[in-house]
Curated annotation (Swiss-Prot):
One of its GO terms (molecular function) is DNA binding. This is 3'-5' exonuclease. Activated upon interaction with the KU heterodimer. Not stimulated by ATP. InterPro entries: 3'-5'_exonuclease_dom, 3-5_Exonuclease_domain, RNaseH-like_sf, RNaseH_sf. Its EC number is 3.1.-.-. It is an enzyme of class 3 (hydrolase). Expressed ubiquitously. One of its GO terms (cellular component) is nucleus.
């Protein structure tokens, strides 16, 4: 696919740079207004192995949204958050191996491997869970529809995360079986909407989903609309980076860049990790 086929549907380079500049200015002003602190921890960059050989009804105008601050108060007793009051957090980054599947054969093979791996991770009731997310090419022009779901990313532990480029591979039967398996809980933020969009685009429905925002309200208290970035800061004191040049970029382009693969895998990993944290917390107790 040539760039002329998609660039008019997305932000221009100048617009993306302007958005990044605005966010950078805002973050700097926040940092300057708070008490001075040491520079944020920078985690070592992990090489992405996505380009190596693989080892083992939503509305059509659905759009991506810029991150929103969480400002509402709550009347629930919350678990202690004092350790997360710093303004500068180390980055949340998936440090395992990223498996990038691009063709129907690769996706089919990897999905079958995942099914076998997940069978070893089931609890006594036969349930296992995965962090799941999707990406697609957004549209910002009136009358121009957003693209079909371009990638499905699945994380089952801290060692491997899969990024499957289904825009090119389609959804083979093995991946459909995994996605529709009701004994595999798929966790993420806004995952109900992801399920509807995937069904709209491919006729495959994500079965048995759990939205981390709802689970967070159950565990932390309140009735907030959590985003993945804000929940990451609150629960594990890390910053989930969301650079617009990647988040709002072209997810249909082949092959995906290392930066796109890292972004996609980290989102799925964050969902998986935060679910583990949340499910071990007691439910919030209503109080004054």
């Amino acid at each position: 696919m040539s760039s002329s086929n998609w660039i008019d549907d997305a932000f221009t380079e100048e617009e993306l740079l302007a958005i990044d500049a605005i966010e950078a200015s805002y973050n700097f002003s926040r940092s300057s207004s708070s008490s001075s602190s040491a520079a944020p921890t920078v985690q070592a960059t992990t090489s992405v192995h996505g380009h190596e050989e693989d080892p083992n009804q939503i509305p059509n105008n659905i759009r991506r949204q810029l991150p929103r601050s969480i400002t509402s108060s709550t009347s629930y007793k919350r678990f202690p958050l004092s350790r997360c009051r710093a303004r500068n957090f180390p980055a949340m980054r998936f440090g395992g191996r990223i498996l990038y599947s691009k063709t129907a054969t690769e996706v089919d093979k990897r999905a079958m491997q995942l099914i076998k791996v997940l069978d070893t991770k089931r609890d006594e009731s036969g349930i296992a869970f995965v962090g799941l997310d999707i990406e697609w090419r957004p549209s910002f022009r009136k009358g121009v529809l957003p693209g079909k779901v371009a990638t499905v990313q699945i994380c089952v532990d801290s060692n491997y995360c899969d990024v499957m480029h289904i825009f090119h591979s389609g959804i083979p039967q093995s991946l459909q079986h995994l996605i529709e398996d009701s004994t595999l809980v798929k966790v993420g933020i806004g995952i109900d909407g992801d399920s509807v969009k995937l069904f709209h685009d491919y006729g495959v429905s994500i079965k048995d989903v759990e939205d981390l925002s709802d689970l967070a309200n159950q565990k932390i208290g309140g009735d907030k609309k959590w985003g993945l970035a804000s929940l990451t800061e609150t629960l594990v004191c890390k910053e989930l980076l969301k650079p617009n040049r990647i988040r709002l970029g072209n997810w249909e382009f082949y092959p995906l860049s290392k930066q796109q693969l890292q972004y996609a895998a980290t989102d799925a990993y964050a969902s998986w990790h935060l679910y583990k944290v949340l499910k071990d917390l007691p439910d919030a107790v209503s109080g004054s």
